[in-house]
Amino acid sequence: MNLENYFISQFQNRYIGNDGAFIDGFVYSKDAFFENVHFKKEWISYYQIAQKAMLVNLSDAIAMNAKPLYALLSVAMPKSMSKQDMRELARGFKEIATKYHVEIIGGDTISNSKLDITITIISKTKKPLLRTGVRDGFLVAYSGKLGNSAKDLKKLFNLGFLHDNSKFVNIKLRKKLVYNTQRYLKAGMDISDGLFSDLEKIALANSVGFKFSKPISQYIACSGEEYEMLLFFDKRDKKTMLRRAKLSRTPLTIFAQVTRNRYRNRCKAHHF
């Protein structure tokens, strides 16, 4: 168990352990997006910073098969930010909120030495997609293509810039895939810390392991901030899942099967 999972385990209750807390039909989720931890200001614009901060938070709601409704923003801003910078930051928040029909209903602002953002999303669902309920024999799949986020991060450190279509800033949320397949899904979560690190969370929550159908490269296994979906479903629903993924225009890769073996994550933790 890595240090992040260890710390979270100190607060165990029936609400903690998923992408958000499901309470009386609502999902409450919160994520941080901090300068010099998740991004460097010289890498991307204020507009892009706000967009990504909103998208990574909406990802948690969508990953739980919930419809995002409201957002609360907390923004710690350096005094060096100009009014134009603030307008660009606000424009990024508002554009993504409008696209996903989310209303920004409040929050907090403070002065700080760097730009730090935390967002709370309030969503609604009748059938939450949880991380528990995984059993021996289930198939394991991920959406989209993994590994590009890590490659783009390496480019940022080496070159200091990215192409406009980089996955580091252009996150694709798999709303259609989740909503169109939720009937067949047994469990799921978004891939934010990397495929193997997020598999570790599932393994710990369900006391299971995984048998991989083929070797997985380091880039695919350990690339964080992908925000693709990690999904679990019954073997008998394999054809249906692949068909519905195709209808959603989402690549779906089945790469493992759930076993009773112990699972060991071989990737370094991103947060601790």
Predicted features along the sequence, with ranges:
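Short, compositionally biased
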Residues: 151-168
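Acidic, Ser/Thr/Pro-rich beta/coil linker or hinge segments at domain junctions
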Residues: 169-172, 245-272
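Small-aliphatic-rich amphipathic alpha-helix that forms the alpha element of a beta-alpha
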Residues: 46-71, 91-99, 174-176, 194-202, ...
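Glycine-rich anion-binding loops of enzyme active sites
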Residues: 33, 69-154, 257
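Active-site-proximal betaalpha loop/short-helix elements
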Residues: 80, 168-226
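N-terminal glycine-rich phosphate/pyrophosphate-binding loops that anchor nucleotide-derived ligands
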Residues: 1-62, 102, 138, 214, ...
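Short hydrophobic/aromatic beta-strand micro-patches
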Residues: 122, 230-234
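Residue-level signal for inorganic ion chemistry
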Residues: 57, 65, 104, 137, ...
